[in-house]
């Protein structure tokens, strides 16, 4: 009870908060989002509309508390403090569900639960799948007087975490490392570091296993499991090859800034591809890759190639060569995403657009 009282007396401090495209609206809300996606700040923003005596906020991942003991004592503490109308639980894991059930029987106006796991589930809760910042949200953190080229450079340097948007560029990698170390077991972190070598490329679990087994005792099954767990935590996404489900999957980070936090090796082209993927992922639609196209979204009849520095004429030449492939796939639009170039053409009803990322990301 003393620990719960200490938490109650120390509510979350006000944080610099800018409205997201997501908001808490349901009385019972389960927020699911990756490490650094802004779950905590979304909760803090919601709670800021209430007096501190009206809510209790608990981070079950806090090293200073015993989560099981906290959940066991929580129903009685809330009964003793009827002025508490809102309960916010951060860093929830499914293993806590049984001890959390008695809490849900209490008559509170709001239950807000946040988890980094996509498979988290609570009966009767509305689910809010919180993505990292997209480009439009990111630039809202900055003055409108800043030119688009500078904003795009900031985006590439800072990544998609709301916390990263506020810190100096040189501190982004260190802050992300701290967040990853505090959230991931050693094996998952080791696998994630190896994933940095496969950014925007076909990932080989065998290669990751071969590298790791020389330094630690690990099985191939454990590597598969760790990679699956990282995907479940929205740390990475694995993209299938179209019509070839057994082919190697292509790996992307859900926050492209993870690459610079995990590796000193720079590869602008691959990081640019990853940045484009992150903008597409917000649609929550099936995304594929093909031999010719970086991304293919069948539902939108859209194919995308990433050409950061190719001028429009070169892209149009490639478009002519790819026209038959586009037609066979039923694609009516090819977009070539660039750093600064632009242009447009069409052949037999299929449109080809060359667009700078900063304009494209605000228009999709």
Protein language model features and the residues they cover:
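N-terminal pre-Walker A segment at the start of P-loop NTPase domains
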Residues: 1-24
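A cross-kingdom feature that marks ATP-driven nucleic-acid transaction machinery
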Residues: 34-36, 41, 242, 249-364
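Conserved P-loop NTPase "ATPase switch" module shared by AAA+ and STAND
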Residues: 77-99
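Short glycine-rich substrate-engagement loop in P-loop NTPases that contacts/grips substrate
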Residues: 53-82
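Hydrophobic positions on the alpha1 helix immediately C-terminal to the Walker A/P-loop
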Residues: 42, 46
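Accessory nucleic acid-recognition modules appended to NTPase machines
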Residues: 176-301
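Hydrophobic anchor at the beta1->P-loop junction of P-loop NTPases
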Residues: 31
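Interdomain motor-coupling "hinge/lid" segment immediately C-terminal to the ATP-binding subdomain
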Residues: 108, 115-201, 206
